[in-house]
Amino acid sequence: MSFYESVFIIRQDISLNDIDKIVDDFAKIIKDNNGTIIKKEYWGLRTLAYKIGSNKKGHYYFLGLDITPNVKEEIERKMKLNENIIRFLTIKADAISSEPSPMLKNQSTENNLVIDVTINN
């Protein structure tokens, strides 16, 4: 098993319930293949640097994963096929930090939000 960090952007018109369903679909694939989601972070609805299709904003979501390369390929394939996901990037990591990501820390200080990080050990 290897550690991966995956960030994906979901269309701005998708509800939070539908976002949870998308993440749950990925979680099912990971669990069925003996992988683990170590950390999940919702970074919120953010303005994109440039317009992607008709989207000026997108819901950003981060996953810290402990999975095999085959599972990574399957998740990326599902992301490509999902029309609600407009961009994604998955990178290999040495480890997954238990601390909130810099994006989440920055968002919480700007908006006085409570940081919500789900960590599974």
UniProtKB/Swiss-Prot annotation:
Binds together with bS18 to 16S ribosomal RNA. CDD domains: bS6 (cd00473). Belongs to the bacterial ribosomal protein bS6 family. The keyword tRNA-binding does not apply. It comes from the Bacteria. SUPFAM superfamilies: Ribosomal protein S6. This is Small ribosomal subunit protein bS6. InterPro entries: Ribosomal_bS6, Ribosomal_bS6_sf, Ribosomal_S6_plastid/chlpt, Transl_elong_EF1B/ribsomal_bS6. One of its GO terms (cellular component) is cytoplasm.
